[in-house]
Amino acid sequence: MVEINRKTKETDIKCKLNLDGCGKININTGVGFFDHMLEALSKHSGIDIDLTCSGDLHIDAHHTVEDCGIVLGQALKKAIFPISAVERYGNATVVMDEAATTCALDLSNRPFLVYEVNVSGKVGDFDVELVEEFFHAVAGNAGLTVHIIQDRGRNKHHILEASFKAFAVALRRALVKNEKLGIPSTKGVL
């Protein structure tokens, strides 16, 4: 179990994360759709996430979403590294009705994000462009290389939910224990 707390003039976030969990969820960011996406991430990764955020929602959800990504990324980095005896790579294609999204990731300790999800506008009152900000913050702070690519879809909610679930399943697969691998790098370090 790792714990990260972060307080700025814009947000106050408390996060507990357990990689060896079973997807126990306690999430409250004040942004309903975003909470729903984080719950999907926790459930489908098998990672216990306890996250609360008090943010400047009177402005908009940008700081809340981005800062939650920063904190979740920091918690993942603290929980994952130094890395040893895991698969390291994970990928998944997840469908939700007409939508399909693929995520491939590497626990590389080299942050990089490719985000090719073609949605714009809002789901309810949630600006969908914030999802890219979230994944950029997670990848950057966790030290992950992440590719999220929309294969098909029309419904924004379905496309974004498939994206979060694909990331979750790919992460779960990358974290699968494999004692034969030791440090999963020809360099001997990640």
From Swiss-Prot:
Task: Give any single GO term for biological process.
Answer: L-histidine biosynthetic process
What does the record give as its pathway?
Amino-acid biosynthesis; L-histidine biosynthesis; L-histidine from 5-phospho-alpha-D-ribose 1-diphosphate: step 6/9
Tell me where in or outside the cell this protein is found: Cytoplasm
- GO CC terms: cytoplasm
The keyword Cytoplasm appears for this protein: yes
Annotated catalysed reactions: D-erythro-1-(imidazol-4-yl)glycerol 3-phosphate = 3-(imidazol-4-yl)-2-oxopropyl phosphate + H2O
**E.C. designation(s):** 4.2.1.19
The signal peptide stretch is none
| Molecular function as annotated in GO | imidazoleglycerol-phosphate dehydratase activity
Q: What class of enzyme is it?
A: lyase
Q: What is its main location?
A: cytoplasm
Protein origin, superkingdom:
Bacteria
Q: Does Cytoplasm count among this protein's keywords? A: yes
Q: Which UniProt keywords are present, listed alphabetically? A: Amino-acid biosynthesis, Cytoplasm, Histidine biosynthesis, Lyase
Looking up HAMAP family in the UniProt record yields:
HisB
Xref: PANTHER family: IMIDAZOLEGLYCEROL-PHOSPHATE DEHYDRATASE, IMIDAZOLEGLYCEROL-PHOSPHATE DEHYDRATASE HIS7
- Family statement drawn from the similarity comment of this UniProt entry: Belongs to the imidazoleglycerol-phosphate dehydratase family.
Q: What is this protein called?
A: Imidazoleglycerol-phosphate dehydratase
